[in-house]
Amino acid sequence: MQQKNWNINLEEMMEAGIHFGHRTQKWNPKMSPYIFTERKGVHILNLTQTARFLSEACDLVFHAANEGKQFLIVGTKYQVSDLIASAAIKARCHYVNQKWLGGMLTNWSTMETRLQRFQDLENKANTGGFNRLPKREAAILKRQLSQLQKYLGGIKYMIDPPDIVIIADQHKESTAIKECINLGIPTICVVDTDCDPDLTDIPIPANDDARSSIRWILNKLTFAIHEGQSNYMLSKDS
């Protein structure tokens, strides 16, 4: 796989607080190769390792996007849910940022039924169909549509399970990771000092609590995806 320069700057990473891990009591020994030192009871991540894995992840998503592959970005912690949505929309990716519903990937046929229901209700709302119903029935359907928009709005155009899943928090998104493992879907996951790097295909050692850290990493990944998508569209047009 040809490597590109993704302009991964260590000073910028420090400014974003990517190097701050959890308190030393919370660590997972499997993260030892990615820890640089300990400072005042807090583990400090080795940003050289972070840069290495992030560059590898950017190469992967660039080449996948260059082949027209589809991506899903997952991050349901309230601190970063808006970042997940904005990054995914910018890179034309699918996303889940409110709650991972069990079976979202492993029970895809049921999810397809829900997405079809979502589309039907949305069409009915857009064409004034609710206005022709009794008030009580219309209110029930509007509530259903609101719930579907909240939880499935980021995947409403996803017609098949994704080719690659990007995950912002290993512990919070453990169900999503298990489903990806069961289906053999490659994952890229931010792993803090209390995580298990063996559970993901490309672990990115980084602070998974700070918005600035997640934003910086997402910006790099979505830029690489966008670059790959641009190449893909050019090749289709030629």
Swiss-Prot record:
Know the name of this protein?
Small ribosomal subunit protein uS2c
Q: Which family does it belong to?
A: Belongs to the universal ribosomal protein uS2 family.
Q: Name one GO biological process term.
A: translation
One annotated GO molecular function is:
structural constituent of ribosome
Claim: Plastid is one of the keywords in the record = yes
Protein localization: Plastid, Chloroplast
* Cellular compartments per GO CC: chloroplast; mitochondrial small ribosomal subunit
> Which keywords belong to this entry?
Chloroplast, Plastid, Ribonucleoprotein, Ribosomal protein
Write down the NCBIfam families for this protein, in alphabetical order. Answer: rpsB_bact
